[in-house]
């Protein structure tokens, strides 16, 4: 009799990826976020599918179709708020997952890391387009402001913006295409996730010590499946608490006002998970400079494998680098706060200082500190 999990072409892949996968024996809860992100993606696709059944991508009916989902569709309010807050959970886990990668030096798996950065861009694009769909005030003006940034690209900029809009302003054509892209991108993301895992399973997982763990592996199932279930439990408790008690906590009240091209909201700002990048964009008084800083604030992640100058992989045994890491986290929290504030004194100055500190820490302080630690250890 053949052993199906090990011989069947499809089941064999699943078996090697989630059951018999050799995993380091010492990976902590920081390694839970991969599975949580996978669950978030599945949840978003599922809730999104049910929302798409009732949503209409037309400027005249989009806003009222969302209202209809919340009021008239069975458990429509639940599906809508699970989708909206699920996106917030998605980004929380993404940022923690990336932070873990930086702290423990997981970026030395360059293929896995670079696909991860592309995934981040894809998820950010999807979330941005999803925010436009309810066609509230912040949807409309957010779409106008962010797409308009592309006009800063020399020579082709203005033409490119009109091409994306499908006209001379954000209108019906824009909404329709954003819905189409918002629907297709999660499936592209799913394919990219598979590539991300394929590259990861070529090398095996990193671990908190940063030392090769080939000599000490345990099967993924049951050890890490049960550990993942605990993470999933915590995630669902947090998500459902948000959805049931404060569904609008992370949203913008302006988005409950239907889109009006003749009335600009006093403070145009994106969802909370983009505020750090928005603060960096706003801190540069030049349009093209701001756009470049915005893009580079994410693209800088691809430089981590190049900038790694320590003889140790992980930060576990490097106290000075740990201080810088937490300084970077604090800096990003300050940027997030500034991104939600109006453009006036003292927020402008704080934003500019935090933006400079962000790039300075990653590009200069972290690599030079790592070199100093090598010297201190006589390496």
From Swiss-Prot:
One of its GO terms (molecular function) is ubiquinol-cytochrome-c reductase activity. Gene3D superfamilies: Cytochrome Bc1 Complex, Chain C. Belongs to the cytochrome b family. Binds 2 heme b groups non-covalently. SUPFAM superfamilies: a domain/subunit of cytochrome bc1 complex (Ubiquinol-cytochrome c reductase), Transmembrane di-heme cytochromes. Component of the ubiquinol-cytochrome c reductase complex (complex III or cytochrome b-c1 complex) that is part of the mitochondrial respiratory chain. The b-c1 complex mediates electron transfer from ubiquinol to cytochrome c. Contributes to the generation of a proton gradient across the mitochondrial membrane that is then used for ATP synthesis. Heme 1 (or BL or b562) is low-potential and absorbs at about 562 nm, and heme 2 (or BH or b566) is high-potential and absorbs at about 566 nm. PROSITE patterns: CYTB_CTER (PS51003), CYTB_NTER (PS51002). Coiled coil: none annotated. Keywords: Electron transport, Heme, Iron, Membrane, Metal-binding, Mitochondrion, Mitochondrion inner membrane, Respiratory chain, Transmembrane, Transmembrane helix, Transport, Ubiquinone. The cytochrome bc1 complex contains 11 subunits: 3 respiratory subunits (MT-CYB, CYC1 and UQCRFS1), 2 core proteins (UQCRC1 and UQCRC2) and 6 low-molecular weight proteins (UQCRH/QCR6, UQCRB/QCR7, UQCRQ/QCR8, UQCR10/QCR9, UQCR11/QCR10 and a cleavage product of UQCRFS1). This cytochrome bc1 complex then forms a dimer. CDD domains: cytochrome_b_C, Cytochrome_b_N. The chain crosses the membrane at residues 33-53, 77-98, 113-133, 178-198, 226-246, 288-308, 320-340, 347-367. GO terms for cellular component: mitochondrial inner membrane; respiratory chain complex III. InterPro entries: Cyt_b/b6_C (IPR005798), Cyt_b/b6_C_sf (IPR036150), Cyt_b/b6_N (IPR005797), Cytb/b6-like_sf (IPR027387), Cytochrome_b (IPR030689), Cytochrome_b_C_euk/bac (IPR048260), Cytochrome_b_N_euk/bac (IPR048259), Di-haem_cyt_TM (IPR016174). The keyword Membrane applies. This is Cytochrome b. Heme b b566 binds at residues 97, 196. It comes from Ctenomys argentinus. GO terms for biological process: mitochondrial electron transport, ubiquinol to cytochrome c. It is found in: Mitochondrion inner membrane. Its cofactor is heme b. It is a multi-pass membrane protein. A ubiquinone binds at residue 201. Heme b b562 binds at residues 83, 182.
């Amino acid at each position: 009799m053949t052993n199906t999990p090990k011989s069947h072409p499809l089941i064999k892949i699943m078996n090697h990826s989630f059951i018999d996968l050799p995993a380091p024996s010492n990976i902590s809860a920081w390694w839970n976020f991969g599975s949580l992100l996978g669950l978030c993606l599945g949840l978003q696709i599922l809730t999104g599918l049910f929302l798409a059944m009732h949503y209409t991508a037309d400027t005249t009916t989009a806003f009222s179709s969302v209202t209809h989902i919340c009021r008239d569709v069975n458990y429509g309010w639940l599906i809508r708020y699970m989708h909206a807050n699920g996106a917030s959970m998605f980004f929380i886990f993404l940022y923690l997952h990336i932070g873990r990668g930086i702290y423990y030096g997981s970026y030395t798996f360059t293929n896995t890391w670079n696909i991860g950065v592309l995934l981040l861009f894809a998820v950010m694009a999807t979330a941005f387009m999803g925010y436009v769909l309810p066609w509230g005030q912040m949807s409309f003006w957010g779409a106008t402001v962010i797409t308009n940034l592309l006009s800063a690209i020399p020579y082709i900029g203005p033409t490119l913006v009109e091409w994306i809009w499908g006209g001379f302003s954000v209108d019906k054509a824009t909404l329709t295409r954003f819905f189409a892209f918002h629907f297709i991108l999660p499936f592209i993301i799913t394919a990219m996730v598979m590539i991300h895992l394929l590259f990861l399973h070529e090398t095996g997982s990193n671990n908190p010590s940063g030392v090769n763990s080939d000599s000490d592996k345990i099967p993924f199932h049951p050890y890490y499946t049960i550990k993942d279930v605990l993470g999933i439990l915590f995630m669902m408790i947090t998500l459902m608490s948000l959805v049931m008690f404060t569904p609008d906590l992370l949203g913008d009240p302006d988005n409950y006002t239907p889109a009006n091209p003749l009335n600009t909201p006093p403070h145009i700002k994106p969802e909370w998970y983009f505020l750090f990048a928005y603060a960096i964009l706003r801190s540069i008084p030049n349009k093209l400079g701001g756009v470049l800083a915005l893009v580079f604030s994410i693209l800088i992640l691809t430089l981590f494998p190049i900038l790694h100058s320590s003889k140790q992989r992980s930060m576990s045994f490097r106290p000075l680098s740990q201080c810088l890491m937490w300084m970077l986290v604090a800096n990003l929290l300050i940027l997030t706060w500034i991104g939600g504030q109006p453009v006036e004194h003292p927020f402008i100055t704080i934003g500019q200082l935090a933006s400079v500190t962000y790039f300075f820490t990653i590009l200069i302080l972290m690599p030079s500190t790592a070199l100093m630690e090598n010297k201190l250890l006589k390496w």
